């Protein structure tokens, strides 16, 4: 089951560490950000969600040091994932093995990050337009099923004034202002 809490915002230590401030959050609080969490005991449950949400494509990513040509390439990829960004499409991940952290911006306190620890069986859906970042835990491994409505793509738009003015970002702000 996913663990959700306020990130401690300590930037002087390994971002793969838990960074738990001690302030736990509920799944209802996460839902107010448009983030959907489900525990799925098996892939059949994931398939049902895919059918309901009209996800037509999928792939599996295995992120660990052995997946890259060198430790430097691995660390570079982790740094890329950890840059604050958004997507124009939902980001849907089902953790098959290992663990990772998805950090999402707290809409009510924008200087805060909300950290979600996902482990095997956890499915997380981030809405289009939400600023977020990802990293592994110190175990340095996650195998995840990625679901897509259309052709598989992963286009990150790093946070900037230009990203703030995108229609997808404005739509996201309108969505969370409903709560």
Curated annotation (Swiss-Prot):
Encoding gene, per UniProt annotation: ADI1
First-tier enzyme category under EC: oxidoreductase
One GO CC term, this protein: cytoplasm
Record-linked InterPro entries: ARD (IPR004313), ARD_euk (IPR027496), RmlC-like_jellyroll (IPR014710), RmlC_Cupin_sf (IPR011051)
Gene3D superfamilies assigned: Jelly Rolls
Protein EC: 1.13.11.54, 1.13.11.53
Pathway where this protein functions: Amino-acid biosynthesis; L-methionine biosynthesis via salvage pathway; L-methionine from S-methyl-5-thio-alpha-D-ribose 1-phosphate: step 5/6
Cofactor(s) required for function per UniProt: Fe(2+); Ni(2+)
Comment on bound cofactor: Binds either 1 Fe or Ni cation per monomer. Iron-binding promotes an acireductone dioxygenase reaction producing 2-keto-4-methylthiobutyrate, while nickel-binding promotes an acireductone dioxygenase reaction producing 3-(methylsulfanyl)propanoate.
Amino acids binding Ni(2+): 85, 87, 91, 132
Role according to the record: Catalyzes 2 different reactions between oxygen and the acireductone 1,2-dihydroxy-3-keto-5-methylthiopentene (DHK-MTPene) depending upon the metal bound in the active site. Fe-containing acireductone dioxygenase (Fe-ARD) produces formate and 2-keto-4-methylthiobutyrate (KMTB), the alpha-ketoacid precursor of methionine in the methionine recycle pathway. Ni-containing acireductone dioxygenase (Ni-ARD) produces methylthiopropionate, carbon monoxide and formate, and does not lie on the methionine recycle pathway.
UniProt name for this protein: Acireductone dioxygenase
Family, as annotated: Belongs to the acireductone dioxygenase (ARD) family.
